């Protein structure tokens, strides 16, 4: 994030920027936050908090290099903070249920696969990487969200892909390919 005090965009321009970004990214951020939180309410709060903070930063003249990954990271941090507060306050978590994937996704079986990731034996980090990758975040964006190196993200996704293929079979190979787009194009071109 850069601070450029003399380059504050007009308020109407910021509002349009936020509205356009919301239209493009809100669904993915909401799905990710819901899967992470296991709470629809917390996911909506995380989404609102992420876009509110984005608006405040932009209104203060700050430039955000990668708005998509920045928003995912803010939503993730919000959910994790809420989980910590909830745990400290000993709020009952048993009433929370999994949040279904919004209907705009055609791959219902892909969503079922995502719900089964813990049973396949994926680590929490691998699961987070897979969920973010299915929201079309690039390796560097996932790295920014999770505070990892892009190479680590690649290794986690490769390991997750191998575990998924082993558990589900090779038929899932093209449906759930987490490879970097260039590597994927090379592999399927041959």
Give the location of each predicted region.
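A short, charge-rich alpha-helical start-of-domain segment used by transcription regulators
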Residues: 2-31, 41-44
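Acidic, proline/glycine-rich intrinsically disordered inter-domain spacer in sigma factors
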Residues: 9-16, 20, 94-120
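The N-cap/first-turn positions of alpha helices
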Residues: 26, 125-126
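Structural recognition of an alpha-helix C-terminal capping motif at a helix-to-coil junction
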Residues: 31, 45-52, 56, 65-77
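Arg/Lys-rich amphipathic alpha helix in sigma70-family domain 2
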Residues: 72-94, 106-109
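DNA-recognition helix of helix-turn-helix
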Residues: 76, 80, 146-176, 189
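Short alpha-helical "packing" element that flanks the helix-turn-helix/winged-helix DNA-binding module
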Residues: 113, 128-130
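Helix-turn-helix DNA-binding module
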Residues: 118, 124-125, 132-155, 162-166
């Amino acid at each position: 994030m850069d601070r450029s005090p003399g380059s504050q965009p007009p308020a109407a321009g910021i509002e349009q920027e936020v509205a356009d970004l919301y239209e493009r990214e809100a669904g993915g951020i909401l799905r990710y936050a819901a899967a992470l939180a296991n709470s629809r309410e917390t996911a909506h709060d995380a989404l609102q908090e992420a876009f509110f903070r984005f608006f405040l930063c932009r209104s203060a003249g700050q430039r955000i290099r990668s708005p998509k990954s920045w928003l995912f990271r803010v939503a993730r941090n919000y959910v994790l903070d809420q989980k910590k507060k909830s745990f400290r306050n000993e709020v009952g978590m048993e009433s929370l249920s999994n949040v279904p994937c919004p209907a705009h996704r055609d791959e219902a079986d892909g969503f079922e696969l995502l719900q089964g990731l813990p049973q396949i034996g994926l680590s929490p980090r691998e699961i987070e990487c897979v969920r973010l990758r299915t929201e079309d975040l690039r390796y560097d964006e996932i790295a920014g969200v999770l505070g990892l190196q892009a190479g680590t993200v690649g290794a986690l996704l490769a390991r997750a892909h191998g575990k998924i293929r082993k558990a589900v079979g090779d038929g899932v190979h093209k449906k759930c390919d987490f490879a970097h787009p260039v590597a994927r194009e090379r592999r399927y071109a041959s």
